[in-house]
Amino acid sequence: MLRDNADDAALVDYCKALQQALSRESALGEPVRALLDLKAVKSTNKRWSWVKKGAPIVIEVGGRDMAAGNVSVIRRDRLYRADGKLDSVGTPKDAFVGGMGAMLADIQQSLFEEASARLKANITPADDWSEVEAHFAEDNKTPGWLDVRWSRPTGAALDHVVERLKALKLTLRNAPMGQTHPEGQCIFTGEPCVERVLVGRAY
């Protein structure tokens, strides 16, 4: 956080040394990539521009941080405290650098678990076509996906499925990975199913 005063040069040197130290670390099998942002804009605008770009960690350093040998750390998976304020944690610089690999791995796992939970919460099983029609007929702006049995039809049978889905503004989205062979009949054709697929609305 530059203040346009005599301390700025020392602060930039402190940050460049931090950047070099971080670049010597590795995480998740890759070298750590650290970018030093010296743009002359408000610190809040700069911070949120990096959050919006998906940076897993935003580091802010001011004069008091430098004097104490610290950095202020904002993790993408913990942006806010319980009181709604920004969760910026002051951390000794050397400890932060040494723990960078573990912190990035922890953030990756945390974001993965959050995304997995959100995905599962938005998938609903459906056992017949009437359930599909009823689900997407509801006044729901975020209907998510339906998990249905599928026989992989081809030719005219597939064309018929596509037309039925199109009438509800739906498409086949994907087949979940790691699924076991399901039992029962395809909800579209009545043939034995070979997998389960997700059906959703295309926007």
Regions found by a protein language model. Give the residues of each.
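NTP/phosphate- and nucleic-acid-binding module
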Residues: M1-Y203
